[in-house]
């Protein structure tokens, strides 16, 4: 990946699958001994192509794991939801563990995705821990599941691999806005005022581009005398976005060394990852809005320069010339892990690591005096943002393995300490010299206005943990796993610093029983588990009281006037005051998630058909939420508390199947797929509606779109039901039949969360040719097309703004008709996507006279996002699931979302 790794699909069907090594919390186990729900994907089965995020490698591959793109921007985040959404404000993303190092989800890194620093070409495998038995050993950060990323290590004879690829990306489909001729007719037809500059401009063509992607990865690996092994790599990626002025560059380096001494009793792992990421972004919201609403009769250019708009606003082509948003992130993740065998079966291990990330982000407008309708752009602006973050981890573990005849017992005990420090400094400047020098390179102390705003913040969080695990197996038939973790976090109050997270799991390898000797099952294992995990992804310091100093600035009613006398006009009348901005809550507790899982693993037809079936029930309780005080005399408007009775429930089924053909012959194949059904709802909520999504824009700001509603699905859309247009005005359902349509006539009309998540794949080998296909999809979800509501009302068409047919679908609709939040803008979000297809050809070096130079030569062609089957009218049904409303996760709202690209790549892989 990210340079198109060699396709090497293993099709040998035998019991080796049971001996497959799976990464679990603080260790490894054979697949046959696993009692929890763990899904694994090796590097040879990753999705191919331009990949910025490890989540993209897995999309469509795993049951129970919904992976969606927040947007199509290069480096955009991936929302990874494991077994349903289980929290409101305290984080919905899994814990990421990279080579044993626990990442901090709150460290954002580059302006988009905190995992951009990892080169996907360096990853050997990804294991997803789904049930509480597998995740409870990680305690307070495991309620949303755990994603364990293991990078490549060296083995065998020395080898050099060079992977090169290049390709192009483009906008798959344009929104069907009017061309100039149709636009002229439609503006007149609705009785509007036509502004006609005699042009014929397709603004979607003007503001998008065919982006070029270039990738290069060089790696070296090997081992010597079973005492020393190494893997070293360098990577380069340069990816243009499909919007102009959109680009991601990443320079990466990786070094993994394993050294053994004392006759193999001492083993030391060194891991080093270094990266530099440069992320260039356009003014996305403005660009998306302009390219679908700008008057098509306005020529893009006049006399070689972007045409001045009649509104005195910025021509978006001019905006691209003077606007720049560049974030540069430098990151180093380094760890050392020595382990020493103290006695037979007894091993001590130290894991020490540091993750340092520093981001500099400059958002600037060069001065452009001709603009009068866009704030301070005419003078030039600069926002300079500095975000250094440090994550230090020290872990000590002691493990013991004991075996006697049919009994096998393994103990693990450990202590972990993690120190997380996040800083942020933002400075805003206004007024720059209008010359060829960018504002960020000018002397800010000489600007017309010194820093107009400055903000500085720093937080430190500490986490101390004690954990243990016991694994017992009898005769390779009966398996028991028990784990326990105690986490103490500085985020919580003095009365509840520690949370306690136990789990237990049972397994039965039925095929090892005597009565199964002649069974058609090659493998049959039954699993059951129950456990409790936690969630501490909440803002820092919220258990502590905070205060604000208020002082008189200028004049009566000044914003900074001490509130006891808002009419004060002199400095000697209440000049200073201290007020509460947050109440202390030393009783704030951990949010917890309890999960029950029943599973079956099976294999048939000499291990050619393998599969898993799981039922799970996940209940999140003790919900953490910022609430309004019950006492109206409280000195603050909100404070953080646990909602004792409220629960979020996710129940579901998972099915995953994989089939390998007979490995004999020149043609072989592998097909597989997975499907997940999830039923979720909010239970015993004391609130009528907890808003997760609210409208934005003129006349609609704050109007509820979706939220958490008692006994309804998560992300339930709550709005008026649109029936049509009568006498020029929208008609809505009178739900309670009282003859009036008011707020209480709003109803739940669907959910943004899909009921079914599915994916399927196929790999075909014929002689030296290989073809791989990967599909993914969702069903049962809705999308609110906020773009339609904001940009395509008939009234805006009448003002010479472009629209689609959506604006004129009701000819008798008046220009004064309000476009309120309703099912008029709610659409089916179901889709099926061919997200990846790769055709590869392996050249046998010996047959072309290159056997002495190369071990392998492979050419490949890859397509990404090749087609989408959907009824959704927007750019793409995967929308901005990464946004928040008041700190609560928002789902299923499409508002000016950056479109996903369609990409084609050619690649060359050389192994020396």
Question: Where on the chain are the PLM-derived regions?
Answer:
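Short loop/turn motifs that connect adjacent beta-strands in outer-membrane beta-barrel proteins
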Residues: 154-158, 225-227, 262-267, 345, ...
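Small-side-chain secondary-structure face that scaffolds active or pore-lining regions
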Residues: 222-224, 240-252, 265-287, 330, ...
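Surface-exposed loop/turn segments flanking beta-strands in extracellular/periplasmic regions
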Residues: 180-199, 288-318, 363-380, 423-454, ...
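Short, small/polar-rich motifs associated with maturation and membrane association
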Residues: 1-273, 333-334, 546, 590-591, ...
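Conserved small-residue
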Residues: 161-196, 425-428, 542-557, 660-752, ...
């Amino acid at each position: 990946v990210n340079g198109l790794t060699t396709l090497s699909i293993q099709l040998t069907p035998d019991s080796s699958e049971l001996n497959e090594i799976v990464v679990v919390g603080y260790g490894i186990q054979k697949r046959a001994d696993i009692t929890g729900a763990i899904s694994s994907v090796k590097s040879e089965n990753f999705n191919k192509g331009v990949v910025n995020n490890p989540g993209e490698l897995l999309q469509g591959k795993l049951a129970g794991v919904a992976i969606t793109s927040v947007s199509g921007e290069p480096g955009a985040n991936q929302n990874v939801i494991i077994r349903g959404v289980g929290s409101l404000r305290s984080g919905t993303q899994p814990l990421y563990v990279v080579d044993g190092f626990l990442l901090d989800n709150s460290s954002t890194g580059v302006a988009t995705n905190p995992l951009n620093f990892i080169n996907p070409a360096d990853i050997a495998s990804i294991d997803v821990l789904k049930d509480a038995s597998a995740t409870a050993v990680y305690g307070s950060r495991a309620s949303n599941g755990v994603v364990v990323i293991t990078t490549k290590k060296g083995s065998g004879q020395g080898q050099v691999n060079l992977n090169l690829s290049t390709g192009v990306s483009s906008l798959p489909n344009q929104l069907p806005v009017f061309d100039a001729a149709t636009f002229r007719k439609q503006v007149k037809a609705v009785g509007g005022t036509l502004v006609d500059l005699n042009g014929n401009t397709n603004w979607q063509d003007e503001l998008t581009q065919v982006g070029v992607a270039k990738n290069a990865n060089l790696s070296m690996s090997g081992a010597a005398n079973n005492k020393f092994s190494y893997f070293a790599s360098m990577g380069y990626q340069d990816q243009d976005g499909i919007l102009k002025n959109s680009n991601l560059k990443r320079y990466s380096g990786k070094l993994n060394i394993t050294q053994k001494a004392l006759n193999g009793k001492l083993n030391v792992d060194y891991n080093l990852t270094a990266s530099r990421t440069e992320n260039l972004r356009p003014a996305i919201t403005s660009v998306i809005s302009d390219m679908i609403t700008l008057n098509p009769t306005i020529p893009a250019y006049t006399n070689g320069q972007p045409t001045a708009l009649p509104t005195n606003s910025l021509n978006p082509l001019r905006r691209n010339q003077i606007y720049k948003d560049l974030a540069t992130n430098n990151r180093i993740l380094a760890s050392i892990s020595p382990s020493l065998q103290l006695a037979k079966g007894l091993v001590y291990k130290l894991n020490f690591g540091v993750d340092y990330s520093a981001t500099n982000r400059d958002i600037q407008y060069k001065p452009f005096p001709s603009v009068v309708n866009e704030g301070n752009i005419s003078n030039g602006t600069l926002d300079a943002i500095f975000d250094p973050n440090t994550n230090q981890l020290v872990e000590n573990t002691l493990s013991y393995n004991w075996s006697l005849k049919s009994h096998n017992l393994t103990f693990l005990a450990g202590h972990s300490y993690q120190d997380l420090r996040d800083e942020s400094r933002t400075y805003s400047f206004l007024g720059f010299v209008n010359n060829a020098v960018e504002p960020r390179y000018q002397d800010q102390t000489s600007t017309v206005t010194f820093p107009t705003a400055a903000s500085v913040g720093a937080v430190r969080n500490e986490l101390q943990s004690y954990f243990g695990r016991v694994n017992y197996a009898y005769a390779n038939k009966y398996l028991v796993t028990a784990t326990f973790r105690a986490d103490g976090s500085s985020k919580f109050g003095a009365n509840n610093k520690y949370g306690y997270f136990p789990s237990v799991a049972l397994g039965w390898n039925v095929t090892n029983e005597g009565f199964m000797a002649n069974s058609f099952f090659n493998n049959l294992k039954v699993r059951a588990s129950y456990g409790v995990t936690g969630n501490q992804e909440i803002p820092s310091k919220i258990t502590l009281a905070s205060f604000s100093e208020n002082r008189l600035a200028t004049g009566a009613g000044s914003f900074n006037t001490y509130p006891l006398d808002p009419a004060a006009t002199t400095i000697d009348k209440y000049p200073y005051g201290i007020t509460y901005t947050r109440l202390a809550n030393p009783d704030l507790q951990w949010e917890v998630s309890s999960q029950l899982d029943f599973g079956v693993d099976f294999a048939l037809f000499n291990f050619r058909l393998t599969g898993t079936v799981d039922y799970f029930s996940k209940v999140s309780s003790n919900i953490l939420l910022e609430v309004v005080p019950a006492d109206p005399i409280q000195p603050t408007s909100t404070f953080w508390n646990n909602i004792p009775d409220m629960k979020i429930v996710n129940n579901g089924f998972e099915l995953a199947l994989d089939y390998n053909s007979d490995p004999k012959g020149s043609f072989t194949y592998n097909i597989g797929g997975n499907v997940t059904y999830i039923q979720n709802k909010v239970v015993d909520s004391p609130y009528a509606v907890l808003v997760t999504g609210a409208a934005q824009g003129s006349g609609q700001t704050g109007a509820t779109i979706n939220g958490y509603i008692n006994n309804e699905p998560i992300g339930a859309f709550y709005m008026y039901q649109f029936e049509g247009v009568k006498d020029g005005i929208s008609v809505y359902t009178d739900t309670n039949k009282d003859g009036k349509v008011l707020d209480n006539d709003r109803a739940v009309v669907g959910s943004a969360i899909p009921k079914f998540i599915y994916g399927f794949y196929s790999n075909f080998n014929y002689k030296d040719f290989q073809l791989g296909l990967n599909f993914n999809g969702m069903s049962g979800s809705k999308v609110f097309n906020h773009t339609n509501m904001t940009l395509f009302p008939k009234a805006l068409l009448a003002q010479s703004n472009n629209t689609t047919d959506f604006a004129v679908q009701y000819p008798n609709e008046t220009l004064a008709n309000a476009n309120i939040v309703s099912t008029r803008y709610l659409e089916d979000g179901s889709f099926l996507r061919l997200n990846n297809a790769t055709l590869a050809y392996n050249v046998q070096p010996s047959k072309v006279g290159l056997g002495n130079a190369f071990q392998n030569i492979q050419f490949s062609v890859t397509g990404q996002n090749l087609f989408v089957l959907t009824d959704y009218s927007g750019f793409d049904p995967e929308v901005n699931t990464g946004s928040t409303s008041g700190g609560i996760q928002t789902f299923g709202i499409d508002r000016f979302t950056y479109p996903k690209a369609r990409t084609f790549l050619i690649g060359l892989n050389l192994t020396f």
